[in-house]
């Protein structure tokens, strides 16, 4: 799993952790439903999770569009509810699941 956090939003560490967790849970649910064999492989491989910082909302949207070109890559777009630090509807995190080759 790869998570791209929107660096332009200046979220606290706790907020970033929560947004990444939302994306991870969403991807996990998608894997259970759509790609159970890939989920099993990922679990047997150590459940690798990588978090990187994106520069902007535009960058996350571009990455999402590129990922959706490959039907084997799962995506999770997290938009904030606006209850704490960030304006409602802000794209906070993009979660991606695929093989290393697919995500590079």
Model regions and ranges:
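Glycine- and Gly-Pro-enriched alpha-helical subdomains that act as flexible
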Residues: 1-34
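Short basic, glycine-rich beta-strand/loop surfaces that mediate nucleic-acid
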Residues: 2-4, 45-55, 68-104
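Residue-level preference for alpha-helix termini and adjacent loops
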Residues: 8-10, 15, 38-41, 77, ...
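Surface-exposed loop/turn and secondary-structure junction residues enriched for glycine/proline
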Residues: 12, 19, 34, 42-45, ...
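Alpha-helix N-cap/helix-start motif
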Residues: 13-14, 60, 87
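Short, solvent-exposed amphipathic alpha-helical segments in soluble enzyme
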Residues: 18-21, 65-69
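Compact, glycine-rich, soluble single-domain proteins
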Residues: 29-47, 53-57
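Short, hydrophobic/π-rich interface segment
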Residues: 58-66
């Amino acid at each position: 799993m790869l998570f791209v956090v929107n660096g332009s939003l200046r979220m606290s560490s706790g907020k970033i952790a929560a947004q990444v967790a939302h994306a991870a849970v969403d991807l996990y649910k998608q894997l259970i439903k759509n790609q159970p064999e890939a989920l099993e492989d990922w679990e047997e491989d150590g459940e690798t999770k990588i978090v990187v910082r994106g520069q902007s909302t535009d960058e996350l949207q571009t990455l999402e569009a590129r990922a959706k070109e490959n039907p084997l890559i799962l995506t999770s777009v997290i938009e904030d509810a606006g209850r704490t630090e960030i304006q409602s509807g802000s794209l906070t995190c993009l979660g991606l699941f695929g093989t290393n080759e697919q995500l590079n």
